[in-house]
């Protein structure tokens, strides 16, 4: 039995939920999100609490049970408070700029890298080497952050690259003569 799936999702004030079979639409002060789920699950709304239950004892239904509950919980949190990720750029001459709807990365390559910013993600840059991403959809935010990190992942010898703010990069010793 799923320990995560058993827990009900409490709906805070200011958040509205629309259910249509397996389609969930959630709107709140930060925006609106919708998702259609697959699998043998049932989603019901009762007394300001959202419940997810499996319809069968099949492996697929049990697998989707906890996953669907976590996704819906993240959607509720996203439209109420939003999500924030902080990326750090380490390296001499490594920096980033926002120009229009593009994020321009200068990462010691022969060319600058331009990444289109999705419409539902906001970018703040307090410094040239710090990128703050904000959005309502946790999945899209993490996906966009991984696209940015993939341009120059942190390397273990000098620590150069793009990483999450508190991410630990195991350092290696250089070669010895």
Swiss-Prot record:
One of its GO terms (molecular function) is rRNA binding. InterPro entries: Ribosomal_uL6-like, Ribosomal_uL6-like_a/b-dom_sf, Ribosomal_uL6_a/b-dom, Ribosomal_uL6_bac-type, Ribosomal_uL6_CS. GO terms for cellular component: ribonucleoprotein complex; ribosome. It comes from the Bacteria. It holds the Pfam family Ribosomal_L6. GO terms for biological process: cytoplasmic translation. Keywords: Ribonucleoprotein, Ribosomal protein, RNA-binding, rRNA-binding. PANTHER family: 60S/50S RIBOSOMAL PROTEIN L6/L9 (PTHR11655), LARGE RIBOSOMAL SUBUNIT PROTEIN UL6M (PTHR11655:SF14). Belongs to the universal ribosomal protein uL6 family. This protein binds to the 23S rRNA, and is important in its secondary structure. It is located near the subunit interface in the base of the L7/L12 stalk, and near the tRNA binding site of the peptidyltransferase center. Part of the 50S ribosomal subunit. This is Large ribosomal subunit protein uL6.
């Amino acid at each position: 039995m799923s320990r995560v799936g058993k827990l009900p999702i409490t709906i805070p004030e200011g958040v509205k939920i629309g259910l249509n079979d397996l389609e969930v639409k959630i709107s709140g002060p930060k925006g609106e999100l919708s998702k259609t789920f697959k699998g043998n699950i049932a989603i019901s709304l009762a007394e300001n609490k959202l419940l997810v239950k499996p319809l069968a004892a099949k492996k697929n239904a049990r697998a989707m049970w906890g996953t669907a509950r976590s996704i819906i919980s993240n959607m509720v949190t996203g439209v109420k408070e939003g999500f924030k990720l902080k990326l750090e750029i380490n390296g001499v001459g490594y920096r980033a700029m926002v120009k229009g709807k593009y994020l321009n990365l200068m990462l010691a390559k022969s060319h600058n890298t331009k990444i289109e910013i999705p419409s539902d993600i906001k970018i703040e840059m307090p410094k040239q080497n710090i990128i703050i991403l904000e959005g309502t959809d946790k999945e899209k935010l993490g996906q966009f952050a991984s696209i940015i990190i993939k341009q120059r992942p942190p390397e273990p010898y000098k620590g150069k690259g793009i990483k999450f703010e508190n991410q630990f990069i195991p350092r290696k010793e250089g070669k010895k003569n």
